[in-house]
């Protein structure tokens, strides 16, 4: 039996590893239940408020088996603590393969420890680059990919990046975007939903296909208040009477509300709501007229759903969302935002499609490859 350790450093990681866990669970219930087993390890604590029970219920996976209990803001301290605690875990719980996902500091720490323990390392969402070495996450990506024995990529552009940086061809596998597995898995459950099923939206005058969704989380965007002021004005003015639903965390809400009061920004059509559950947010975005976001994951899901998406960033880790999909990059430029938003509201968006292998079977490919490799 092959023993896998699946490592998660933060809430979004669980969403990306959930399809893998579901595939393993199906195998354990099949004719050959002894092929593979797994343990799910989380860098944080058991009482982490971002890990609500509903998340795991929506994803149809169990809660982590192990919590390392690391809680600190300083990335260097966090890296050291994760390395120390994860090393002890691996020494006490031998594994054949450690699976990591994305580009967090905790992910890099787990990758380093895995290689020091001479355990095979598999990286999901490998080969993603911003080409901005001043970004901490870019450093993490370079380290994780450089250490990985198996690199699972979402697109051919990611393969090309990994190969150019020296990864052997035999180590790189284009399996598709694993986020899409969740959307396909959830389609039947979401199909019976309506906007009225979402408590946070009660009382809002919403109709499917006739509202916008706005998410904002990047610290750099929130910190530049002069530019944020301009972008909020453009957002509200250009949307006109179309409602804008903004499921935002407290830090973003505080910045936006303080700025609107200080600068007298009229946000008559912006409806700020609390963060939604996983399935609720999936339905909200799938039924939207368009999405304005700084999240790469949200943009990827929008591409699969064919929903117009404006990304408030000058780059994307998955360029397929721009070249093939429904995504448009406007950076932090208010006038580019105005132009793109005008097209979005008018319904004159570009033609778009779904990138190759974004078919909901990425996790199956991952597990098949891991089982076939010696």
Map each language-model feature to its residues.
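Nucleotide-activated sugar donor-binding and catalytic core shared by glycosyltransferases
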Residues: 1-244, 251-374
């Amino acid at each position: 039996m092959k023993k896998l350790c699946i490592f998660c450093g933060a809430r979004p990681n669980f969403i990306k590893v959930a399809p893998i866990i579901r595939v393993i669970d199906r195998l354990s219930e099949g004719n050959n239940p002894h092929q593979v087993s797994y343990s799910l390890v989380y860098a944080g604590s058991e009482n982490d408020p971002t890990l609500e029970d509903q998340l795991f219920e929506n994803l149809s996976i169990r809660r982590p088996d192990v919590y390392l209990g690391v809680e600190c803001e300083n990335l260097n301290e966090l890296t050291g603590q994760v390395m120390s605690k994860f090393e002890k875990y691996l020494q006490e719980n031998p594994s054949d393969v450690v699976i990591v996902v994305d580009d967090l500091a905790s992910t890099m720490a787990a990758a380093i420890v895995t290689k020091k323990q001479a355990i095979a390392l598999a990286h999901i969402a490998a080969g993603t680059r911003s080409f901005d070495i001043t970004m901490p996450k870019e450093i993490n990506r370079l380290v994780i990919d450089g250490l990985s024995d198996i690199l699972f990529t979402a697109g051919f552009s990611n393969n090309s990046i990994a190969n150019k940086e020296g990864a052997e061809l035999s180590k790189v596998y284009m399996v598709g975007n694993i986020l899409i597995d969740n959307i396909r898995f959830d389609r039947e459950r979401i199909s019976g939903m309506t906007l009225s099923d979402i408590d946070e939206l009660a009382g809002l005058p919403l109709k499917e296909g006739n509202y916008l969704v706005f998410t904002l989380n990047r610290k750099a965007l929130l910190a530049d208040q002069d530019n944020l002021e301009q972008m909020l004005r453009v957002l509200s003015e250009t949307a006109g009477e179309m409602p804008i639903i903004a499921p935002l965390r407290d830090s973003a809400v505080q910045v936006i509300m303080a700025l609107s009061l200080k600068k007298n920004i009229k946000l008559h059509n912006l409806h700020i709501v609390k963060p939604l559950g996983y399935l609720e947010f999936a339905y909200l975005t799938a039924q939207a007229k368009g999405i304005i976001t700084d999240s790469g994951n949200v943009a990827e899901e929008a591409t699969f759903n064919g929903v117009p998406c404006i990304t408030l960033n000058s780059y994307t880790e998955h360029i397929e969302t721009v070249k093939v999909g429904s995504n448009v990059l406007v950076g932090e430029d208010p006038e580019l935002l105005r132009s793109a938003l005008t097209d979005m509201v008018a319904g004159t968006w570009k033609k778009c499609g779904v990138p190759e292998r974004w078919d909901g079977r990425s996790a199956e490919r991952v597990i098949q490859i891991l089982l076939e490799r010696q």
